[in-house]
């Protein structure tokens, strides 16, 4: 770590893990969230959908070897792309656009049932961060067949395949084609 005087210095830090992810002390952001447990007896743990994602390399190699749009779609089924959308077209005029990346499998039903307590709904409303009740076994992320644990599978991610046209507009990712809204 760079020091104020320009010299480097070694900084040690202990990271704590739980079955839900890395435990965080958010006291530097808001004093009430500091310490373990917090004022209301909770602990914050952050789950990273890509923490154990080593599938990306396989995904990109398969993209590079693809001979058709079907090959591209088959490659995406690994759910290896960490965070970006996929857009592709073939020589026959068929196009594809999808958000086939590592996305936590938190259905709206799970969010409605498991975002609880005085803080979690506020975090969701203000920061769009889903904070599930880790004390309830019914509040675990879901699993899709053929997908890595706790992630949405290929069949449940937004995507469209079309012959007319497709567009990628990051802030309007759900609108690649007005006839095929995501």
Segments from the language model and where they lie:
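Mature extracytoplasmic enzyme cores
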Residues: 1-182
């Amino acid at each position: 770590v760079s020091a104020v005087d320009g010299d480097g210095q070694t900084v040690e830090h202990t990271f704590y893990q739980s079955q839900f992810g890395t435990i965080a002390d958010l006291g530097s952001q808001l004093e009430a969230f500091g310490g373990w447990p917090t004022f209301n007896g909770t602990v914050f743990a952050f789950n990273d959908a890509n923490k154990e994602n080593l599938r990306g390399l396989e995904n990109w190699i398969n993209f590079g070897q693809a001979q058709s749009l079907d090959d591209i779609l088959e490659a995406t089924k690994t759910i290896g792309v960490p965070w970006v959308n996929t857009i592709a077209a073939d020589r026959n005029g068929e196009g594809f656009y999808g958000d086939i990346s590592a996305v936590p499998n938190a259905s709206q039903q799970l969010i409605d049932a498991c975002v609880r307590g005085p803080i979690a709904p506020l975090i969701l409303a203000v920061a769009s961060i889903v904070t599930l009740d880790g004390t309830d076994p019914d509040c675990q992320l879901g699993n899709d067949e053929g997908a890595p644990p706790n992630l949405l599978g290929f069949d449940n991610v937004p995507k469209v395949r079309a012959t007319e046209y497709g567009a990628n507009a990051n802030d309007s990712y759900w609108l690649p084609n007005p006839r095929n809204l995501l």
